[in-house]
Amino acid sequence: MQQSDDKQQAGGKKKAKGIRPPNKLASKVPKQGGKPAHLAIAEAEQRVENLKEEYIAHLKDDMAEVEELVARYTDSRDPKALKLLFRVIHNMRGQAATFGYPLITQVGRSLCLYLLEQEEKGETPELLLITLHADALKVIYREQIMGSGDSISQETVIGLMKAVELKTGEKLLR
């Protein structure tokens, strides 16, 4: 049943009538029962593990596409290849850290920033910097470098970020 508020204004005239819809939320929430927390957590962890396997399979396709697009840009300097490369890298980096590949996220972020900045300035991106980023991604994928990797992996990522910082003036390292 809906409740209403009739407000009296000075002089006996009614002001506005407010209608309050019924609150049915409480009836939708169970008062007891449901899965025990440890089972719900175990199921959620299993789902994440399944998604991780899907991500790794998808990553293989993405890496092949990155390689193809870099080769296409190398041969033709086709700006469409760069736009597609940006899209693929942007998608890869978005989920990489969630599934244990933060280095892919960092390298992808660096390359995406570089490509965006060059486009905004109307400048042609340097092939060498694109290739170095793509090669780093290939190594991370091929060697299955998860987590923050070893010191060489970290130094490589920092080196790529510094190169992009020099080219763009944008801060990547914090």
Where are these predicted regions, by residue range?
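Long, amphipathic alpha-helical coiled-coil segments characteristic
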Residues: 37-83
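Histidine phosphotransfer helical core of two-component systems
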Residues: 51, 80, 115-131
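Short, charged, amphipathic alpha-helical segments
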Residues: 79, 83-87, 127-131, 151-155
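Generic structural signal for well-ordered, non-transmembrane alpha-helical segments
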Residues: 57-60, 64, 90, 109, ...
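Structural secondary-structure packing elements that flank or coincide with functional cores
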Residues: 2-32, 130, 134-173
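Extended, amphipathic alpha-helices with heptad-repeat/coiled-coil or helix-bundle character
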Residues: 79-117
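Secondary-structure edge/capping motif, primarily at the C-terminal ends of alpha-helices
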Residues: 66-77, 96, 115-122, 144
